From Swiss-Prot:
The protein's name in its UniProt record: ATP synthase subunit delta
Any Pfam family matching the protein: OSCP
One cellular component term from this protein's GO annotations in UniProt: proton-transporting ATP synthase complex
Gene transcribed to yield this protein: atpH
Its membrane topology: Peripheral membrane protein
UniProt KW keywords: ATP synthesis, Cell inner membrane, Cell membrane, CF(1), Hydrogen ion transport, Ion transport, Membrane, Transport
Keyword presence, Cytoplasm: no
Keyword Cell inner membrane: yes
UniProt GO molecular function: proton-transporting ATP synthase activity, rotational mechanism
UniProt-listed InterPro entries: ATP_synth_OSCP/delta_N_sf (IPR026015), ATPase_OSCP/d_CS (IPR020781), ATPase_OSCP/dsu (IPR000711)
Known function: F(1)F(0) ATP synthase produces ATP from ADP in the presence of a proton or sodium gradient. F-type ATPases consist of two structural domains, F(1) containing the extramembraneous catalytic core and F(0) containing the membrane proton channel, linked together by a central stalk and a peripheral stalk. During catalysis, ATP synthesis in the catalytic domain of F(1) is coupled via a rotary mechanism of the central stalk subunits to proton translocation. This protein is part of the stalk that links CF(0) to CF(1). It either transmits conformational changes from CF(0) to CF(1) or is implicated in proton conduction.
Family to which this protein belongs: Belongs to the ATPase delta chain family.
Protein's cellular compartments: Cell inner membrane
Protein species of origin: Teredinibacter turnerae (strain ATCC 39867 / T7901)
Cited NCBIfam families: ATP_synt_delta, PRK05758.2-2
Amino acid sequence: MAEPITLARPYAKAAFEAARDASALQSWSDALVEAAAITRDSKVKALLSSPSLTAVQKAAAFIDLCGDTLNEAQKNFIRVLADNNRLPLFPQVSQLFELYKANQEKAVDVELQTAYDIDDAVLAKLATSLTEKLDRKVSLQTAIDPSLLGGAIIRAGDTVIDGSVRGRLAKLAETMSH
């Protein structure tokens, strides 16, 4: 069977295109995040996996759980997912939607791990450099990890730059063992 993220991709893309065309990216984002949270509930999981309910009943129940926050297009999206037995994929749909949204908005979340606390001026300079290099608006989150010994690890999407002392020592050890 295919991975859930793979199954969710066409639905996330369809939701993104509908949201973009309606200039409603944030509304859709909020709705998908809420739907993903609802889907994670154990009682909802049981409801969605119940063979005694039809797709129409599952969609209606799910829409009721979402409350009055959904517009008609979002309700129709839920109905399509229910018709295709894909309601449990909402967490993956939401995750992919956020990636498409960030790409549209030319934004990227960057995680910076360092061994020590970094000065704000250095962080600002790094954010500026990353913005230029990635051609995206950078949202920088920092974390301190003393096990790095020194240097830093930068994660931006699927790009990882390991400039840590720990990483360099690991490379050296690998080179010496061959």
